[in-house]
Amino acid sequence: DSXVPEXFDARKXXPN
């Protein structure tokens, strides 16, 4: 997802 830091999944809503 754009603008989302690497390792962060916006779909999960939490850090991966």
From Swiss-Prot:
Enzyme Commission number(s): 3.4.22.-
Keywords recorded for this protein, A-Z: Hydrolase, Protease, Thiol protease
Single Gene Ontology BP annotation: proteolysis
Keyword field contains Hydrolase: yes
A single GO molecular function term of this UniProt record: cysteine-type peptidase activity
Function: Involved in the dissociation of the larval fat body on metamorphosis.
Family, as annotated: Belongs to the peptidase C1 family.
Protein name as annotated: 29 kDa hemocyte proteinase
Species whose genome carries this gene: Sarcophaga peregrina (Flesh fly)
